[in-house]
Every structure is written in structure tokens, then in C-alpha cells.
Amino acid sequence: MRLILLGAPGAGKGTQANFIKEKFGIPQISTGDMLRAAVKAGTPLGVEAKGYMDAGKLVPDALIIGLVKERLKESDCANGYLFDGFPRTIAQADAMKEAGVAIDYVLEIDVPFSEIIERMSGRRTHPASGRTYHVKFNPPKVEGHDDVTGEPLIQRDDDKEETVKKRLEVYEAQTKPLITYYGDWAQRGEENGLKAPQYRKISGLGSVEEIRERAFGALK
């Protein structure tokens, strides 16, 4: 099972990624984790990546793909792997294809932006404990205060409506085109000797369990 998970920030990809990893016994491939590990280990690619990072520059796609190919050779990838948050752009998707990185499924978790804004902007956090609430879906007993300590709750900057909207705008511009990219490739079939992935789209609305069953059903 080799798959890419697509969906907007706040669509619930992280939660479903954990279920999928557990069910199929596959690792989640995080480019951030790979970069940090390569830099720490001092591999040739890691040293090169560190140069860009220290200069405050983005690590080039070609270097990231090199790290991906190294990572996929490790034994825990024998049964497959799951990409969440990569590729983010058409250029990265093209680079993966050219590098011969095989993908069986592209699974999109679809949630309307209005729902995502409500989900994320309604979150409230108790800073000391990390306890989280939601003004609509999981409200505290006393509005604006932690159930255990009674201390005030905060809204993290990441959860503020204007921040959420900006993240969704970036997704719309950069990552959403991947949905068309993989959908079109699935229709065209094999390219460059690489089998086209099957493209599946599920609704990300409903309970966590309902979405999990939809995801498992789509990956049969």
C-alpha cells in the first residue's frame, strides 16, 4: 500500500493517516523528519540540505526527492508507505514521477472550506496543560475557562480565522492543483513505465469513525 493523502489544512488528514498506518503496517513519510534525520546523521544529502537551511533558503525539490528515495529503501517501507503533506506542488509531483516513486492510491479527504474555518477558529486551548476545547463541538463547562483549573483559555494564533483563511488560500493556489494532476494521470494510465495511481475522494464530514470506514473502503 503506497499512497498520498491529500486535503486542506484542518481536513483531518493526520487522524486518518494514523488509522491507515496502523491498518496496513506502513510508515508515514515526513519530509521534515527526513531532513532533520539526514542533517543529524551528516549524510551527503543532509550536509547539502543543511547549507540551504542555515542560509534560510528552501531546500530544492531535487534534494528532497533524493532523501525520499533513500528513505523508501529502508526495511519498514517493504509493505508500502504513506505521504502526508508531500508533494505540495505540481513540480514536486513531477519530480516524484521522474524519480520513479511508485504510488498505488491518491486519497483526497474533502471538507468544505467553511467547515474547516468553523472547526479551526473554534478551537480553544489551556496553555499550561495543552487541553483543547471547541466553542461549538466540545465547549468547556464555563465559557472561556479550563474545566480542571478554571484558568482562562486562549485561541492560538494558528487557529485565528484570518490565519486559517490564509493557509487555505495557500492550499488553494499550491496544493489543490494536485487533485487535478493525479485525477488526470489516473485517467491517462501508465506514464514513463510508472503505473498511474488510483484516485479516490471521500467526504471528511461526519464522525472520525465514519471517515475512517470511508477511507478503508476507498483503499480496497
Swiss-Prot record:
Pathway: Purine metabolism; AMP biosynthesis via salvage pathway; AMP from ADP: step 1/1. GO terms for cellular component: cytoplasm. AMP binds at T31, R36, K57, L58, V59, G85, F86, P87, R88, Q92, R156, R167. One of its GO terms (biological process) is AMP salvage. The keyword Methyltransferase does not apply. It catalyses: AMP + ATP = 2 ADP. Its main location: cytoplasm. Residues 122-159 are annotated as: LID. One of its GO terms (molecular function) is adenylate kinase activity. ATP binds at G10, A11, G12, K13, G14, T15, R123, T132, Y133, G206. Residues 30-59 are annotated as: NMP. It is found in: Cytoplasm. The keyword Transferase applies. Its EC number is 2.7.4.3. Keywords: ATP-binding, Cytoplasm, Kinase, Nucleotide biosynthesis, Nucleotide-binding, Transferase. Monomer. Consists of three domains, a large central CORE domain and two small peripheral domains, NMPbind and LID, which undergo movements during catalysis. The LID domain closes over the site of phosphoryl transfer upon ATP binding. Assembling and dissambling the active center during each catalytic cycle provides an effective means to prevent ATP hydrolysis. HAMAP family: Adenylate_kinase_Adk. Belongs to the adenylate kinase family. Catalyzes the reversible transfer of the terminal phosphate group between ATP and AMP. Plays an important role in cellular energy homeostasis and in adenine nucleotide metabolism. This is Adenylate kinase. It comes from Burkholderia lata (strain ATCC 17760 / DSM 23089 / LMG 22485 / NCIMB 9086 / R18194 / 383). The gene is adk.
